[in-house]
Amino acid sequence: MKLQSLLVSAAVLTSLTENVNAWSPNNSYVPANVTCDDDINLVREASGLSDNETEWLKKRDAYTKEALHSFLNRATSNFSDTSLLSTLFGSNSSNMPKIAVACSGGGYRAMLSGAGMLAAMDNRTDGANEHGLGGLLQGATYLAGLSGGNWLTSTLAWNNWTSVQAIVDNTTESNSIWDISHSILTPDGINIFKTGSRWDDISDDVQDKKDAGFNISLADVWGRALAYNFWPSLHRGGVGYTWSTLREADVFKNGEMPFPITVADGRYPGTTVINLNATLFEFNPFEMGSWDPTLNAFTDVKYLGTNVTNGKPVNKGQCIAGFDNTGFITATSSTLFNQFLLRLNSTDLPSFIANLATDFLEDLSDNSDDIAIYAPNPFKEANFLQKNATSSIIESEYLFLVDGGEDNQNIPLVPLLQKERELDVIFALDNSADTDDYWPDGASLVNTYQRQFGSQGLNLSFPYVPDVNTFVNLGLNKKPTFFGCDARNLTDLEYIPPLIVYIPNSRHSFNGNQSTFKMSYSDSERLGMIKNGFEAATMGNFTDDSDFLGCVGCAIIRRKQQNLNATLPSECSQCFTNYCWNGTIDSRSVSGVGNDDYSSSASLSASAAAASASASASASASASASGSSTHKKNAGNALVNYSNLNTNTFIGVLSVISAVFGLI
C-alpha cells in the first residue's frame, strides 16, 4: 500500500470554518441562549427516518449510484456475465444496493487500524484502486463509528471529509491531524510550558461551562483534550465547533460523503454494569436519540441543552445552542477512556503528583461524574415509549451516556440494522481487543445477534453467527467472513437483515494488536498500523486471494439479486463457498478469549441467553433460532433520576489537572 500522494487540499476545514453561524453562539465551549420559533417541537417519535435524513438521502443516492456502479464494474470485470449490473443500476433506483461501513471501538488501535481499512476502500488513497477496494467508501451511504472508531469517522467527517491519505501526507506539518506522538496527558512532551498552557485552557473551558449553569463531568475534560488531536487547525482544538456545524458544510449538504453516525449507551448512575438491554443512543448531524423501545424518540442535536417538556422549550421561543460541542459528543462515545485518566498512577508522573490527582479523580468517578451528562434531559416527558417499556429515561432530569461499547457491542451495528435504513450489506470493521493478545474474537457480532432476542430487540434482525470459540477455532477472526449470505435461511427473523462482511484486525506487515490504553504512537507506528489495516481489509493487497475484490462485489449485490430472483454470477458461488460462514460450529473451549476493555458484563437474562448463537445457529438458519417467543420480554435497564452531582469535587480536579501538567 502506498500512502504518499497528497490527494486532497491541506485546507480541509475551509468550507466548515466559513459557516460560523453554525458554531457555538459564543464561539466558545459555553452553550448560549438563542431565539427559536415559538411553536418549535424538538422531539419526534422514532417511527421512521427524519425528514432531513430522507431529503439528504436523495442527494447521496445520486453520488453512490455512480460510485458503486463504477466499483462493481471493476470488481466483476473478470466475471463471465455481468448483465445483473444493468438491472441494479437502471432506471429503478430501488434496485440499487445500499451499503454501510461500521468502525469498531478500541482506542487509537481502532482509529489507526480502522483508518487503514477505510483507506483501502477510498479511491483517494494511492494504490486503493489497483490493490484495494477503492471506491467502496464513495459508494457507502452510512458510516458509523464507536469510541476509537468514532475518533476515526468524526475526524474525517468534521474535517470537511478529508481522507486518511491526506492525514498521512501531512504528518510532518505543524498542527497535523492525529499527532499522537505524545500522550494526551502530556501533548507537548517535555515542553512543560505548552502542556501546562493547554491544560489551563481546558480547565478554563470546562469551568466556564459550569459557571454558565450547566452540569459538567470528566467527559468534558476528555472531549476538550481529544479535540486538539482531531481538529488541530481550529482555535484551541475547535473550542466552539459544534456537531450540527456539519449540516452547513457543502460536502455534507450536497451528499458527497456518507452519513456519519456515532453510538453511545445509556447508563444508570451509581452502577457500572451496562448490559445488552441498555438503551442505545445514536448521534447524527441532524438528531440524537434512540430506536429502542425504552425511548423511541429523537431530538434536534443542534438544540441540546434546551430545557424542554415533551419537546417544547419551557421558555417559549428560547433555546440553547452550542451544547453539541464536537469534542464533547466524540468523548461521549469513548468515555471508557475516563478510566485512563483515572489511572494516572500508572503513568510517568512523579508519584506524589499522580497520587494527588488520582484521589480527586477517584472521588469524581465515585460520584458518577465520569460519564457524559446531558442536562437538562432533552427527552423529559417525551412519551413515545413502546408498549411495556420502562419510563425512567423520560422521568429523569438528566440523561447519562457512556462509551458505546460498554454493552460489549463494540461494532456500531444497531443503527445500521434499522429496517427504515434499507441497507443490503454492512462492512463491519472489528478492531476490538477481545483476546488476551488484543485481537478480536467476534464477540461484538455475537452480542448484537443476541440483542435481537432481548427486550430492546423487538424490531431488530441480525443474521446467525457462531459463538466466540467457533470464531477462533475456525479462524473466522483472522480473515474476512460473510454472514447471512442466503436470505432464504433468514425468514424466521423479524425481517431480512443486511448481509454482514466481517473484517477483523489481523497481522500482516505490523503487529496491529496494540493495547487499547496505548496512548502514544510514533510516526512509524502510526503508518505501520494504517498499512496493516489496509492489508487486513484486502487479504494482503489481494496477495492472499486475487479473487477477493470480486467476492466483495458478490456480497454487495447478493441481497438485491435474491430480491429480484435474478441469476447469480457463477463466480459468486465459489466466493460464497470461500467466505460465507456455512453454519459449522466448533465450540471447543479456547483460552484467552471472551475478554474486552470494559469492566461491565454485557448479558441478557437466562431465557435470552438460551437463544445465543452457540446454541441456535449450528445450521445456516434453524427455525428454532428465530427467537420469536423471546421478543415480548419486558424492557431492560434504563436511566433514572439522579441529581446529586458533586460538582465541587470536579472544580478541585480541574485545578489539580492544570497544576499536574504544569509540573511535568
From Swiss-Prot:
Glycans are attached at residues 26, 33, 52, 78, 92, 123, 160, 170, 215, 277, 307, 345, 388, 459, 489, 513, 541, 565, 582. GO terms for biological process: glycerophospholipid catabolic process; glycerophospholipid metabolic process; phosphatidylcholine acyl-chain remodeling. Residues 1-22 form the signal peptide. It comes from the Eukaryota. It is found in: Cell membrane. Residues 635-664 form a propeptide. Belongs to the lysophospholipase family. This is Lysophospholipase 1. The lineage of its organism: Eukaryota, Fungi, Dikarya, Ascomycota, Saccharomycotina. The gene is PLB1.
